[in-house]
From Swiss-Prot:
A single GO molecular function term of this UniProt record: metal ion binding
Entry protein name: Rhombotin-2
Free-text function comment from the UniProt entry: Transcription factor that acts synergistically with tal1/scl and gata1 to specify embryonic dorsal mesoderm to a hematopoietic fate. Induces globin gene expression together with fgf.
Signal peptide feature range: none
One annotated GO biological process: erythrocyte differentiation
InterPro entries: LMO_RBTN_TF, Znf_LIM
Key words, A-Z: Developmental protein, LIM domain, Metal-binding, Nucleus, Repeat, Zinc
LIM zinc-binding domain segment(s): 28-90, 92-154
Entry-linked Pfam families: LIM
SUPFAM superfamilies linked to this entry: Glucocorticoid receptor-like (DNA-binding domain)
Source organism of the structure: Xenopus tropicalis (Western clawed frog)
Alphabetized PANTHER family for the sequence: LD11652P, RHOMBOTIN-2
Length: 158
């Protein structure tokens, strides 16, 4: 679940911020360090207030309060996009074997098709591809350069 991070200010004359709060700083407690927030700028996320340095990914520790960052909150964990997708990302099906691809698995992608690494091989000769190898995508089949002519000829007969 993705959550918005709101940047707040205690300065009523500061125009660029999203919203100005008229709350005495002593009443705000940081959701991370549990200390009072006396900073001019602070964040609001997951129904709590945060020092800018305290709102961070629970796994990798990257700051989530930076401009353009998204906060993902699931199972009580604050996560950056990368870690969220690594843990809970969308599973899919391999275009070759139709078996499940887990979110953390390494894959090969060709256009809108996704393949397990072990399934990313020539449909004709079963040779696994190396970096720089040329191939053609025919429907969901990947065919190496050497087998393109035979593969298309064989499929035309079917």
């Amino acid at each position: 679940m993705s959550s918005a991070i709101e940047r707040k200010s205690l300065d009523p004359t500061d125009e660029p911020v999203d919203e100005v709060l008229q709350i005495p700083p002593s009443l705000l407690t940081c959701g991370g360090c549990q200390q009072s927030i006396g900073d001019r700028y602070f964040l609001k996320a997951i129904d709590q207030y945060w020092h800018e340095d305290c709102l961070s990914c629970d796994l990798c520790g990257c700051r989530l309060g930076e401009v353009g960052r998204r906060l993902y909150y699931k199972l009580g964990r604050k996560l950056c996009r990368r870690d969220y997708l690594r843990l809970f990302g969308q599973d899919g099906l391999c275009a070759s074997c139709d078996k499940r691809i887990r979110a953390f698995e390494m894959t090969m992608r060709v256009k809108d098709k996704v393949y397990h690494l072990e399934c990313f091989k020539c449909a004709a000769c079963q040779k696994h591809f190396c970096v720089g190898d040329r191939y053609l995508l025919i429907n969901s089949d990947i065919v190496c350069e050497q087998d393109i002519y035979e593969w298309t000829k064989l499929n035309e007969m079917m």
